[in-house]
Amino acid sequence: MEQNADMEPDRQVNQRPPRFRARGAGVRGRGRVRRSAFSRGQRRPIIRVDDLQLPDPLYVMQALQRDHTLEMPRGQVDFSWIEAEERRVGPTDEWYFEAVKTYKAKPGDDLQTIIKNYAKISLECGAVYEINSKIRVTGACYIIGNCAVLRPNLPAGEAMFEVLNVDFIPSIGFMERIVFSNVIFDCRTTATVVCCISERNTLFHNCVFSGPHMLCLDLRAGAEVRGCHFVGAVCALRSKGLYSIRVKNSIFEKCAFGVVTGSKASISHCMFKDCTCSIMLGGQGTIAHSQFIVTTSAEAPMNLQLCTCEGNGSHVVPLGNIHFASHREASWPTFYANTLVRVRLYMGRRRGVFHPKQSTLSMCVIAAPRGVVQRIYLFGVYDATCAIMQLGEAGNAASERLCTCGFRHSTPSLRATYVTDTRIDRELNSQDTAEFFSSDEDNF
């Protein structure tokens, strides 16, 4: 600091009077550009690759174009400015998530207007936000919940959030889809509401859905749900259309319907506890590294009698705890390394062979119609206490049940028959082999 004192004679150092000191011979400067050398409104110079003098043993730096520059990071800007700039010059890869300013929303603010103007909003930690009207999201939206509570005050069946595919979403890195993170959806009243109806690809990260929600998530354009917790909901997640969904690291507890989807689904590292129907899969999918546990059959919602319909109600069958609906063209889902305890698995008519490899079926029942039980392959499966049953019609007996479509149907009663010829003959196949070995165990 004393070496540059001749450049700033009026500056005081440690409250001492200024003094003038000449730079001695052979004393170099500090080698950095002082900020005062540029005007206040002038931008910092662009650092180009040629100026860095990086080592280039492979001679690849010469092939870089002049527009490949390293620019110093800029400050945050408003989302509205980025949106207007993209409308003017078109999409670019210049903006990223960290460059967008975050708006601090407070309880009582108009969330619909704030989301439209700022897109990236942050809620107060632990605050309670009363939702008195439906919030329509038409463009970009990124909500940082900070464990804030969203409590609805809406009529029965009304949605808290409705994501519409109306406005375009600017090309901002890591903000390409709708995001809800660390939000608690709490429903304490008797009025059942829907948390979110989405017609865009949406991400729900580490959210909690607590209370008697009629439907937590109605996903119509694909979504990803990870690290979420669903408690006491009538239906936790429902997907329609041809879009696929992905659910991982989530917990479903005491829900009448867990995941109901007619399209492709990927479910991994999830836990389903005391759900009347944990999964109803109508299309192809993958279920891996998940747990399905039933602890009681007398308490709600396990005492409910449910069903599912096919062909607009023309064919109705009872609903199992894990239900694979019949499909003419779809194959059986990939079922790998899952744990089932006291679970009833229903299998409709599909193509191929069902092989629950490396899965544990403890005190479970696999129920399937005639002609399907012969397609169950139990090689490499822990099936000591698992029963396989073939279902058939039991006359004209029927009962009315609640269906996955939301209506009630007359469901025929079925007759079950034990089947044992699908098991592996352990007198000929030893268990002291590589049958129960996995390549993933080499890492432990």
Swiss-Prot record:
Pfam families per UniProt: Adeno_E1B_55K (PF01696)
Subcellular location: Host nucleus; Host cytoplasm
Any one GO MF annotation of this record: ubiquitin-like ligase-substrate adaptor activity
Keyword Phosphoprotein assigned: yes
InterPro entries: Adeno_E1B_55kDa (IPR002612), Pectin_lyase_fold/virulence (IPR011050)
Keyword tags: Early protein, Host cytoplasm, Host nucleus, Host-virus interaction, Modulation of host cell apoptosis by virus, Phosphoprotein
One of the protein's GO biological processes: symbiont-mediated perturbation of host ubiquitin-like protein modification
Residue span of region Disordered: 1-35
Residues the record lists as Phosphoserine modifications: S438, S439
Main subcellular location of this protein, as a coarse class: host cell
Entry keyword Acetylation: no
Gene Ontology CC: one annotated term: host cell nucleus
Quaternary structure and interacting proteins, as annotated: Interacts with host PML-4 and PML-5; this interaction promotes efficient subnuclear targeting of E1B-55K to PML nuclear bodies. Interacts with E4-ORF3 protein. Interacts with E4-ORF6 protein.
Function as written in the Swiss-Prot or TrEMBL entry: Plays a major role to prevent cellular inhibition of viral genome replication. Assembles an SCF-like E3 ubiquitin ligase complex based on the cellular proteins ELOB, ELOC, CUL5 and RBX1, in cooperation with viral E4orf6. This viral RING-type ligase ubiquitinates cellular substrates and targets them to proteasomal degradation: TP53/p53, LIG4, MRE11-RAD50-NBS1 (MRN) complex, ITGA3, DAXX and BLM. E1B-55K probably acts as the substrate-specific adapter of the SCF-like E3 ubiquitin ligase complex.
Family membership: Belongs to the adenoviridae E1B 55 kDa protein family.
Domain notes: Contains a PML interaction motif that allows the subnuclear PML localization.
Protein name (database record): E1B 55 kDa protein
Lineage: Viruses, Varidnaviria, Bamfordvirae, Preplasmiviricota, Tectiliviricetes
